[in-house]
Amino acid sequence: VRPPPASRALAAVRRILAGIPLSRRKVAMPVYVESVTQPSPQDLTDLAKIYADAPEWLLTPYASAEALIEAALADGSLIAGRFNDRLLGAALLRRGDEAWRLSHLCVRKVTRKRGVGRRLLEETQRLASEAGKPLRLAAPAGHLEASALAARTHLPLDSL
């Protein structure tokens, strides 16, 4: 009797992982990207934690993380990555007539390096492509982190 296909696939993954040292394994989280329009109290707590981990320059032109979240909810530009009913990363996505602009991308410090930011970016690229719009990144001028992300993703970078 052969095991079901799912069991065979899991066994194959285990065989592959057995040959990779634990220190070299990257754990990607199954993150679901969504527009945040009616956040729950827990979502608001998660968003506050996400942007509490943001460097000060990332909040520009907003006076605070709270102001950024409030403005993004008001204009419908807030997107977030969810895993196990918790928001782990967020960004602002402005859907313009000529192009879409992604800005203020931030992931909670405790979940960085697990694919949350990459998942937000990939889903944004997919949605922009489906809408027939080019995607551009936007960040305050002169920040190396934003320039590095633009270079890695081959996306144009606009100044906020």
Range-by-range predicted roles:
Residues L22-Y62:
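Short amphipathic alpha-helix that is part of the acyltransferase structural core
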Residues P55-L78, R82-F83:
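Active-site rim helix/loop that mediates acceptor-substrate recognition in acyltransferases
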Residues A80, R86-R94, R101-C106:
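Conserved beta-strand in the GNAT
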Residues R95, R108-R114:
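Active-site acidic-Proline motif in GNAT/NAT acetyltransferases
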Residues K113-R126:
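Conserved acetyl-CoA-binding loop-helix of GNAT-fold acetyltransferases
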Residues A128-A141:
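Conserved GNAT acetyl-CoA-binding A-motif
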Residues A138-P140, H154-L160:
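Conserved catalytic-core motifs of GNAT/GCN5-like acyltransferases
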Residues A146-L155:
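Conserved active-site tyrosine of GNAT-family acetyltransferases
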